[in-house]
């Protein structure tokens, strides 16, 4: 919908969320597109671009995006999706990325989300059934967690959000494990489970616009 895309070359140096939706002019997909449009700047601030895809045609995409501008949902109104939506009538891209799931539909892409890093590597994937809309706080959290892990060489624990402790990598040798037990420290409960405090400010300074 924004012209021809050369992927991933056009997005070199940026994070990308590539997501598929089952069909234009469907209610759950409409709510998702409105939410993506309303929150697009939040992802842009994280140096993350958004690309949509379905196996509908270009003219269907254009008509639907124009119709969305007139709708209201969950306090969102007057939104204009500006991210590109791929016309994949041939299902070529959808098949390559595993977006067609026989258990769901042979003629619709499932709700898939691919998190792609600046090197063009797929770092995470989430699949949703046709009936379930995506959680956009979680999509943003995944991007922030991946970037935090890369910038600080750490891992992020369950339910992590910026400002919460992060996980230090597990020791790779018995000597390192023994050293951790000996040194201990406030964040180490055992040789394999050590956390580290990282303030929200320090994290956001490192991951915004990078």
Predicted regions and their residues:
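Chalcogenol-based redox active-site neighborhoods
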Residues: 1-210
């Amino acid at each position: 919908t924004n012209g021809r895309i050369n992927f991933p070359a056009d997005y070199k140096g940026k994070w990308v969320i590539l997501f598929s939706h089952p069909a234009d002019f469907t209610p759950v997909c409409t709510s998702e597109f409105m939410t993506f449009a309303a929150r697009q700047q939040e992802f842009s601030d994280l140096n993350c671009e958004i690309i949509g895809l379905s196996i509908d045609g270009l003219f269907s995409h254009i008509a639907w995006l124009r119709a969305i501008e007139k709708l209201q949902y969950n306090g969102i109104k007057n939104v204009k999706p500006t991210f590109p939506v791929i016309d994949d009538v041939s299902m070529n891209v959808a098949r390559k990325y595993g977006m067609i799931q026989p258990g769901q539909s042979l003629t619709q892409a499932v709700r898939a989300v691919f998190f792609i890093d600046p090197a063009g590597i797929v770092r995470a994937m989430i699949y949703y059934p046709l009936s379930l809309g995506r959680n956009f706080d979680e999509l943003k959290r995944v991007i922030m967690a991946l970037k935090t892990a890369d910038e600080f060489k750490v891992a992020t624990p369950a339910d992590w959000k910026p400002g919460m402790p992060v996980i230090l990598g597990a020791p790779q040798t018995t000597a390192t494990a023994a050293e951790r037990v000996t040194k201990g420290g406030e964040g180490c409960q055992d040789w394999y489970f050590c956390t580290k405090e990282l303030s929200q400010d320090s994290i956001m300074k490192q991951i915004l616009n990078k």
